[in-house]
A protein has these predicted regions:
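Helix-biased detector of long, well-ordered alpha-helical tracts
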Residues: 1-182
Length: 182
């Protein structure tokens, strides 16, 4: 969203330096931290992981859940779904202003099609649901979803881990949802 705004000559002076600094910052230290925790606990910390580039958060999460459910189906296990907290996602200052101005990246519409296919499914069978969906007005819900459809160019990491590691990871990572059985 930030770069789409820049291409439209919308300047976000309050966020520009923070965004650029984060773009050039390697995320290798986060991977190294996961390896350290795995060494400490003597077991795998991560069930699945991906970086959020191209398909936005929703697209990558969809791929992770569908892949897990294929494995689970072939092993006669109950399928999973994810409950997301739309207010757990952080955004740079000014990003929601850009969303309200209808600033979108070039991949937004294709990512929106992915979301629409997920969202039109009956809520009970949907692989991605939203914890606070019923308490939000439609405008706020759409703004939050727009954030999750933005194709990051240097995206953060999305990991799925066992709930027992939540307290260990919460200092440098943040929880945006939980995986539950369908």
């Amino acid at each position: 969203i930030y770069f789409a705004g820049q291409m439209q000559n919308i300047n976000m002076l309050g966020s520009s330096s923070e965004i650029i600094n984060n773009l050039v910052k390697s995320q290798q230290y986060l991977i190294d931290e996961i390896y350290l925790f795995q060494d400490q606990f003597k077991e795998s910390l991560v069930n699945a992981a991906t970086d959020i580039t191209g398909y936005g958060f929703i697209g990558h999460l969809k791929e992770m859940v569908e892949s897990s459910n294929l494995y689970r189906q072939s092993n006669n296990l109950e399928p999973l779904k994810v409950l997301l907290d739309l207010f757990a996602f952080k955004a740079y200052p000014g990003v929601f202003d850009l969303i309200r101005k209808d600033v979108k990246s070039t991949f937004f519409e294709s990512n929106k099609e992915i979301f629409d296919k997920i969202y039109k499914v009956n809520k009970q069978k949907r692989i991605i649901n939203f914890l606070n969906e019923n308490s939000l007005d439609q405008e706020t819900f759409n703004e939050r979803i727009s954030l999750l459809l933005d194709p990051q160019t240097c995206g953060p990491l999305l990991i799925s881990c066992n709930r027992k590691y939540e307290n260990v990871l919460k200092d440098k990572w943040y929880k945006v949802g939980e995986v539950v059985k369908m």
